[in-house]
């Protein structure tokens, strides 16, 4: 899940960029409160985005003030105060990281050492937020079961991850949750799974690992897929998700920070999709540029 949901920073207002960074620090502090300091190493902007939009949907304003922390011990910076929603998001972040490394170990990749860093934090999540741990565990188990069927359906392949985010939104939003919020987070979760699968196309092809895009289209590489006629189908899949996100947003009321939420959802996700479809990674580094640089 990690690394794909980002703001389109050149189009952020200064106030929104300040808020975005402050909420990133807030989630970091939330992780430390619930799971301990070592668990902060798994912090991602993906969960920061969830903090932005879920505080908004719950109608809860975020209090920000200058503070010091372990990382910024000399110079203070703007940080969001930690509330119960932030703590829940910190628990979600830690559970996701722990299970990610568990999955890496099962796939034969290195991950045991890294997982140890999050073991104590994960145990705290299980004790204090068992519902969050259950949501993550059961949906990831369903994801594993689906992938073992070797389905070539993109919808079926992404369903468990999409449901995981939708289930968490129901839990975190409480009485503010409704069909439109569930549809929104389902579409976001589906996008995350599919953009990750597309990004991993070449790696999975080389390893012989499961990837729905490989089974559905059979191209030799990600770039070969995008350059072919089938590339238009892939683009259509993502455009359909963007439509679903816009449709869900049109039915929701945002009390605070609408500009930041819209930037991430309506500009950030399409930007990241374009980046991956052009052959670059999530950070915008392209293989072709790397090769040219070596020459």
List PLM regions with ranges.
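Acidic catalytic motifs of isoprenoid enzymes
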Residues: 1-183, 190, 194-241, 245-257, ...
């Amino acid at each position: 899940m990690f690394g794909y949901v980002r703001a389109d920073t050149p189009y952020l207002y200064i106030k929104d960029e300040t808020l975005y960074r402050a909420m990133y620090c807030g989630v970091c502090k939330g992780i430390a409160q619930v799971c301990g300091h070592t668990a902060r190493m798994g912090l991602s902007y993906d969960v920061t985005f969830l903090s932005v939009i879920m505080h908004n949907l719950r109608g809860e304003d975020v209090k920000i003030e200058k503070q010091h922390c372990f990382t910024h011990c000399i110079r203070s910076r703007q940080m969001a105060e930690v509330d119960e929603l932030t703590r829940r998001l910190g628990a979600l972040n830690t559970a996701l990281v722990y299970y990610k490394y568990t999955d890496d170990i099962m796939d034969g990749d290195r991950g045991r050492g890294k997982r140890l860093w999050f073991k104590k934090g994960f145990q705290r999540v299980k004790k204090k937020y068992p519902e969050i741990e259950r949501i993550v565990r059961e949906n990831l188990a369903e994801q594993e079961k689906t992938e073992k069927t070797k389905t070539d359906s993109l919808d079926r392949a992404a369903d468990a991850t999409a449901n995981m985010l939708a289930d968490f939104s129901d839990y975190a939003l409480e009485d503010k949750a409704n069909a439109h919020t569930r549809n929104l987070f389902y579409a976001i979760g589906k996008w995350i799974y599919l953009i990750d699968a597309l990004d991993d196309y070449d790696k999975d092809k080389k390893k012989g690992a499961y990837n729905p895009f490989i089974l559905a289209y059979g191209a030799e590489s990600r770039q070969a897929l995008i350059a072919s006629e089938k590339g238009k189908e892939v683009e259509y899949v993502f455009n359909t998700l963007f439509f679903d996100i816009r449709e869900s947003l049109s039915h929701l009321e945002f009390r605070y920070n609408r500009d930041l939420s819209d930037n991430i959802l309506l500009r950030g996700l399409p930007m990241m999709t374009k980046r991956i479809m052009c052959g670059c990674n999530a950070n915008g580094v392209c293989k072709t540029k790397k090769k040219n640089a070596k020459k």
